């Protein structure tokens, strides 16, 4: 619509919530796909093709104008059309330019004369300058987790009261009463044995020693006080061991004791079930971080390794030359991460103590800073250090929500392509993140090795081995001459398999693409099918006709399958193939492997179990929302990770998801035939049952 009369009445507030990237998601369903911000109030919700929360807001409030956060379109509900005009003050134009600057984190502007005016605050510094906003969100994380604990405590109290009235609860109370009586009898028997032991010891000490013992005491006089006198003094001061039997415990107290038992009680928050706040179109990062944290071996590596201490050691001065403290000479082992330095040095205790924190009490600010600091303490930003810190919080079983400010800051600094609040691709982010982590480990391990303790160098090599090999596999590219049957083999490494959809899903224009579900096994078969080489691509002496085939010759421990859902449509447009891909919990890779290379493997080595799924919600490449399904081995259930909102789900719901990236974990490794023991650190990764 060229002219919308409702725009002229618009009065936009300068502190509108749309200027805060953390608000760029639906307040009801948490999606970042097709998000519309009301221009009359601070409400942000999804469009009518998602859950219609923005439309419902208009029906309740009668606020007509809304702006799409990512595409910057303005829509009028009263006119039922898009708005092209602006008000007299040009608020819409100013709002669009402001949002574009926030999204790209580029605050430069050009005057009419062509001069570029740069903001006094750089893009990186602008992230750090909003300490008030970060502190506010951290307090919200604290309050959210405290509320989580409070709700579960009340639910537990109500459940225990109800359980005490049921036949099963009464039986449980009777069993606990009998167990207490048996424990009391064992305690009494133990005390009687203790008294008898003390009595025999006193009698032995009161008897005169033998001659040989007296001579030995004269030769080597003992400066210690006689133990018998000390024991008699202690017995006089100590309370009598003969105590009355404890009063019988009431059923209510006994049931409460059962619920509060440290042996049986599980953490209120299951380790790993911690939400990540969306800081502004960061769902791509949150979904990948959830996936990596649920890969057991990957997580255990970074829980042990903290490169922050090593990098501070190497970067003690700007020239790269550093001297170790006299307390830690070269070759000595530095203190562990959980220890603290001497006075005047920064604390390295990364694991916060939650003694009074979020179990209904207030945690001090120092513990909050140890979770995700607002700014890395060292000039050398470390992705490994941020992974170490974030995984500690997510798997502590204490926090229900955390804001990954420091992780986002490190990504902005080290991976400039993801700088800003624009929507990004999760697959590209995963590849870039792993590449940067690998480079950081290689650089840290080889730079000034004499300054790094031997134990730390060994740990860095082990973690680097995990990062390099956990997704690493090998492909056999085999070209066969159709005339002389000569075969040319080439080994190529891979870290994921990008699978294309069959041709029936690639029609465009007048032809209609098929909407029948596609099978994952069909896409794998297409990846390994024989392909004819046309033209003078292949030269075999006098022959030229050949065919090529890709086969897997070395299986990775974690198999990443990237479904190529986005295709080019026209010159500059990429559209999405939205067909459902059927995949199972178990995947047999034997049909797609080279028989000659894998002939010595056991049959179980080809079996993979589904461990994680990344989903893309939306219709286009440049827009949409990412969520993830992760199998949590601590709780033995699947979790749907939608930024800050997490909930358990059934595996049937997982298999119905519109998958974008699939993660399968090898059930038995090919080196030794044991369950997932390829990598050297800690326990073997726990895979979901088939």
UniProtKB/Swiss-Prot annotation:
**What SUPFAM superfamilies does the entry give?**
Cysteine proteinases, RING/U-box
Give compartment(s). Nucleus
Example GO molecular function: cysteine-type deubiquitinase activity
Q: Name one GO cellular component term.
A: nucleus
| Residues covered by region (Disordered) | 173-272, 319-366
For bias type Basic and acidic residues, the affected ranges are: 173-190
The main enzyme category here is: hydrolase
Ranges for the USP domain? 274-667
Keywords, sorted A to Z: Cell cycle, Cell division, Hydrolase, Metal-binding, Mitosis, Nucleus, Protease, Thiol protease, Ubl conjugation pathway, Zinc, Zinc-finger
Substrates-to-products reaction catalysed: Thiol-dependent hydrolysis of ester, thioester, amide, peptide and isopeptide bonds formed by the C-terminal Gly of ubiquitin (a 76-residue protein attached to proteins as an intracellular targeting signal)
Q: Where does Zn(2+) 2 bind?
A: 26, 29, 46, 53
Q: What does this protein do?
A: Deubiquitinase that plays a key role in the spindle checkpoint by preventing premature anaphase onset. Acts by specifically mediating deubiquitination of cdc20, a negative regulator of the anaphase promoting complex/cyclosome (APC/C).
Protein name, as recorded: Ubiquitin carboxyl-terminal hydrolase 44-B
Q: Which gene encodes it?
A: usp44-b
């Amino acid at each position: 619509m060229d002219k919308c009369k409702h725009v002229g009445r618009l009065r936009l507030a300068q502190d509108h919530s749309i200027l805060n990237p953390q608000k760029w998601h639906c307040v009801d369903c948490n999606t970042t796909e097709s998000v519309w911000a009301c221009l009359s109030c601070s409400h942000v919700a999804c469009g009518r093709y998602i859950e219609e929360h923005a439309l419902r807001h208009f029906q309740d409030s009668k606020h007509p104008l809304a702006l799409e956060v990512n595409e910057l379109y303005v829509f009028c509900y009263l006119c039922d059309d898009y708005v092209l005009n602006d008000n007299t003050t040009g608020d819409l134009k100013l709002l669009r330019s402001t949002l574009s600057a926030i999204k790209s984190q580029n605050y430069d502007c050009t005057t009419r004369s062509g001069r570029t005016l740069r903001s006094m605050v750089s893009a990186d510094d602008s992230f750090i300058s909003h300490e008030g906003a970060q502190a506010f969100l951290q307090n919200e994380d604290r309050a959210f987790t405290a509320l989580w604990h409070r709700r579960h405590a009340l639910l537990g109290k109500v459940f225990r009261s109800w359980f005490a009235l049921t036949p099963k609860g009464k039986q449980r109370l009777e069993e606990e009463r009998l167990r207490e009586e048996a424990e009391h009898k064992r305690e009494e028997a133990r005390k009687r044995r203790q008294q008898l032991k003390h009595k025999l010891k006193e009698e032995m000490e009161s008897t005169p020693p033998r001659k040989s013992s007296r001579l030995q005491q004269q030769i080597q006089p003992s400066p210690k006080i006689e133990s018998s006198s000390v024991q008699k003094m202690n017995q006089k001061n100590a309370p009598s061991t003969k105590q009355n039997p404890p009063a019988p415990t009431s059923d209510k107290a006994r049931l409460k004791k059962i619920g509060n038992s440290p042996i049986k009680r599980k953490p209120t928050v299951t380790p790993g079930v911690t939400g990540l706040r969306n800081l502004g179109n960061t769902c791509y990062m949150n979904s990948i971080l959830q996936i990596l944290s649920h890969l057991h071996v990957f997580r255990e590596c970074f829980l042990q390794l903290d490169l922050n201490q090593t990098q501070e050691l190497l970067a003690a001065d700007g020239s790269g030359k550093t001297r170790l403290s006299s307390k830690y000479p070269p070759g000595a082992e530095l203190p562990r991460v959980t220890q603290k330095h001497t006075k005047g040095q920064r604390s390295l205790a990364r694991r916060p103590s939650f003694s009074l924190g979020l179990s209904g009490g207030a945690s001090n600010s120092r513990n909050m800073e140890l979770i995700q600091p607002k700014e890395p303490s060292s000039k050398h930003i470390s992705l490994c250090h941020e992974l170490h810190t974030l995984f500690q919080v997510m798997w502590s079983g204490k926090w229900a929500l955390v804001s990954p400010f420091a992780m986002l800051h490190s990504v902005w600094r080290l991976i400039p392509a993801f700088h800003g609040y624009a929507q990004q691709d999760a697959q590209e982010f995963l590849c870039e993140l792993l590449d940067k982590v690998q480079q950081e480990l290689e650089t840290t391990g080889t730079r000034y090795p004499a300054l790094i303790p031997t134990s730390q160098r060994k740990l860095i090599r082990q973690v680097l081995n995990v990062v390099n090999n956990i997704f690493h596999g090998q492909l056999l590219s085999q070209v066969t001459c159709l005339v002389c049957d000569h075969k040319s083999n080439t080994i190529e490494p891979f870290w994921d398999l990008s699978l294309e959809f069959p041709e029936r899903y690639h029609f465009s224009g007048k032809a209609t693409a098929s909407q029948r579900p596609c099978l994952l096994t069909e896409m794998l078969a297409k990846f390994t099918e024989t392909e004819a080489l046309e033209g003078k691509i292949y030269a075999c002496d006098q022959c030229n006709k050949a065919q090529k085939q890709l086969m897997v010759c070395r299986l990775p421990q974690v198999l990443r399958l990237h479904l190529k859902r986005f295709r080019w449509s026209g010159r500059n447009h990429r559209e999405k193939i939205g067909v459902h891909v059927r995949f199972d919990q178990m995947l047999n890779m034997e049909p797609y492997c080279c028989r000659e290379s894998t002939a010595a493997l056991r049959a179980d080595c080809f079996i993979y179990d589904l461990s994680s799924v990344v989903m893309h919600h939306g219709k286009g490449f440049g827009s949409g929302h990412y969520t993830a399904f992760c199998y949590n081995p601590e709780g033995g259930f699947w979790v749907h990770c939608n930024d800050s909102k997490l909930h358990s789900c059934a595996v049937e719901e997982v298999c119905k998801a519109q998958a974008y990236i699939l993660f399968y974990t090898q059930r038995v490794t090919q080196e030794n035939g044991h369950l997932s023991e390829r990598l050297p650190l800690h326990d073997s990764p726990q895979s979901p049952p088939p």
